[in-house]
Regions:
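N-proximal low-complexity "stem/linker" segments adjacent to membrane-targeting elements
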Residues: 9-77
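Short, acidic, metal-binding catalytic loop of nucleotide-sugar glycosyltransferases
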Residues: 76-85
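Conserved short acidic donor-positioning loop in nucleotide-sugar-dependent glycosyltransferases
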Residues: 78, 92-95, 151
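Short beta-strand-to-loop acidic/aromatic patch adjacent to the donor-nucleotide binding site
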Residues: 142-154
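Conserved nucleotide-sugar donor-binding catalytic segment
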Residues: 191-249
Length: 249
């Protein structure tokens, strides 16, 4: 038997496009979709330690991402999150004059998205912009948890909320499974080893992430960050969430 949320969503989706994709009906469909996502994923963490804080949106999640002349898929995925207390910091790799009008319009449409740029293009897999992002977070952006991603990555709508639900007082970082373009978009079961996890899979407490820092500008910089997180808190304070909540592209 279908849940009420699923049935109502299906009913509204049968309306003509000029009705279902506008105004109050569109907002209702989005809300129902979010509720259905949370219903279907509730078994992942049946009794979240921070249930009340998550329900009240007390935690702020910061996402740091490089960007270079690309459409910000990441921003679209965050705007669609079931959890709305987040701030996205885009750091453009060099002057941003060539970023497209559509991308610029999307970035400017949401006050939770902050945009800065480096003085010169580094062209080092986005690591210099990430380092600048860490400096910006440390000096100017308050929050509780931090995620490092990339502008063309996609976080499924329940990513932020489900990752937060996995935390408790004995957990400093949570990581999830992913779908990866390098592996034909199949489900990729992550583990804390080189080539088996991407930084976009990981959410860490802000203080732990800043203490680890972004220290490597080589191709292996993503893994070095995860490795430095492990050095900061130890594997026992990492928790694995067995769900594919992140799409690397």
């Amino acid at each position: 038997m279908k849940a009420v949320t699923e049935s109502l969503y299906s009913l509204l989706s049968r309306l003509p496009p000029e009705i279902r994709d506008k105004g109050i009906v569109l907002r209702a469909r989005n809300r129902l979709r979010h509720w259905e996502i949370l219903r279907r994923t509730s078994p992942l963490t049946p009794n979240p330690a921070y249930h009340n804080a998550i329900k009240d949106r007390d935690f702020k999640v910061i996402i740091v991402s490089p960007i270079y002349k690309s459409f910000p898929v990441l921003a679209v995925s965050l705007i669609e999150q079931t959890y709305d207390n987040w701030e996205l910091l885009f750091v453009h790799d060099g002057p941003s004059g060539e970023i497209g009008d559509i991308a610029k319009s999307l970035i400017e449409s949401d006050k939770r998205i902050r945009f800065i740029e480096t003085e010169q293009r580094a062209n080092d897999w986005g690591h210099t912009p990430r380092q600048r992002g860490f400096q910006e977070v440390e000096s100017k952006i308050e929050g509780d948890f931090l995620v490092v991603s990339n502008s063309d990555n996609y976080h499924v709508p329940g990513y932020v909320e489900k990752m937060l639900e996995a935390f408790d007082d004995s957990t400093d970082a949570v990581y999830c499974d992913m779908s990866h373009d390098y592996y034909s978009w199949r489900n990729f079961h992550t583990r804390l080893e080189y080539s088996f996890v991407d930084c976009g899979c990981v959410m860490a407490r802000r203080d732990i992430a800043l203490a680890a820092g972004w220290n490597d500008n080589s191709y292996e910089g993503d893994w070095k960050y995860v490795s430095d997180l492990v050095d900061q808190c130890g594997t026992k304070r990492f928790k694995k969430l067995n769900a594919t909540l992140f799409v690397h592209s």
